[in-house]
């Protein structure tokens, strides 16, 4: 009786019915072992179907259906054809090597291979060395980058400081230019003040025709242009004050006479041995040139002080020459003497004498200003 068992195709898993009558009789252990091998092959990691088929002695050892058998056979034929092509290729290359390198021997190739191997080892050592150097360079590069970042940060701070300092410099330069402009302006004004005769500003002396003036007060008297004694007294007070300032300016003092400026009641004081001996009034009342004014002694003493001042100025500057010479109680113009006292004098000549006296005072002012030390 024929025994049949149910199996499945190892490839497509379709059920198969195998006739085991054609199988080689084995022991039960052998049959059990064969089934175990098939099961392990089917459930194993590789499931090497070709190996099972190749190792099978009977169809029942590796059951495969006809379709899968044909497919496997065709695949094996394709692999065999591929292997044949590879064999031909290798054979062709072997023939090429034999033809083109007939003298190449195995020892030479081994030696060459050894050299290549040694060179490879040397290159590997060089590569390790280069890798170590590269690692060190990476460390150095990181260090330098950190240093560069710190330097860049410091450079940024320094740039900010430079910017702030530069802005401060520009502001200081602007302020310096402003101060320099102010200094130049002050220097110009100072030069103007230095070149300005303060006495000329404070005591404006002007001679218009015959009648002379000082600070707007007329010092003269004409019948066709009468001047009150109040104005003449004010003018005399101005010239006494000016004479006092000029004597103080050059640092001299008459040994006996001293001008005392008291406005419209000025006078000349006579001192001997430190004692006030007498005063000479330079103010009058009534009608000028009437003979009763009483200012002639004061005018004489004033002319003495003026002559003393002009002499001191000439001693300090030999080139200085007063416009008009003083002789006793007169002033000389082109050899003509003009008496400065009112008694027995005409209005024109006395007025002319006062104008000449004012001109000498104006010249004394200019000379005192020229003698002062530069500031």
Curated annotation (Swiss-Prot):
Q: In which tissues is it expressed?
A: Expressed in PVM touch receptor neurons, the ventral nerve cord and in the nerve ring.
The terms under GO molecular function for this entry are: phosphatidylinositol 3-kinase binding; protein-macromolecule adaptor activity
Q: What happens when the gene is disrupted?
A: Embryonic lethal with few surviving larvae which fail to carry out the L3/L4 molt and few surviving adults which are sterile. At the L3 larval stage, accumulates vacuoles in intestine, hypodermis, pharynx and coelomocytes. Abnormal accumulation of mig-14, lmp-1, and rab-7 on these vacuoles. Mislocalization of several components of the retromer complex, including rme-8, snx-1 and vps-35. Impaired fluid phase endocytosis in coelomocytes. Double knockout with either sorf-1 or sorf-2 results in smaller endosomes and an irregular distribution pattern of PtdIns3P in the cytoplasm.
Which UniProt keywords are given for this protein, alphabetically ordered?
Answer: Autophagy, Cell projection, Coiled coil, Cytoplasm, Endocytosis, Endosome
- Which is a Gene Ontology cellular component entry for this protein? cytoplasmic vesicle
Extract one GO BP annotation from the record: determination of adult lifespan
Q: What is its main location?
A: cytoplasm
Compartments where located: Cytoplasm; Perikaryon; Cell projection, Dendrite; Cell projection, Axon
Respond yes or no to whether keyword Lipid biosynthesis is given for this record.
Answer: no
Give coiled-coil spans as residue ranges: 71-147
Q: Can you tell which superkingdom this protein's organism belongs to?
A: Eukaryota
Q: Describe the protein's quaternary organization and the partners it interacts with.
A: Interacts with ced-9. Interacts with vps-34. Interacts with sorf-1 and sorf-2.
* Family stated for the protein in its record: Belongs to the beclin family.
- Summary of the function given for this chain in its UniProt record: Regulates autophagy. Together with phosphatidyl-3-phosphate kinase vps-34, acts as a core subunit of the PI3K complex that mediates formation of phosphatidylinositol 3-phosphate (PtdIns3P), thereby regulating membrane trafficking. In association with sorf-1 and sorf-2, negatively regulates phosphatidylinositol 3-phosphate in early endosomes to allow for the conversion to late endosomes. Involved in the clearance of engulfed apoptotic cell corpses. Together with ced-9, negatively regulates somatic and germline apoptosis. Plays a role in endosome-to-Golgi retrograde transport of mig-14.
Recorded protein name is: Beclin homolog
Source organism of the structure: Caenorhabditis elegans
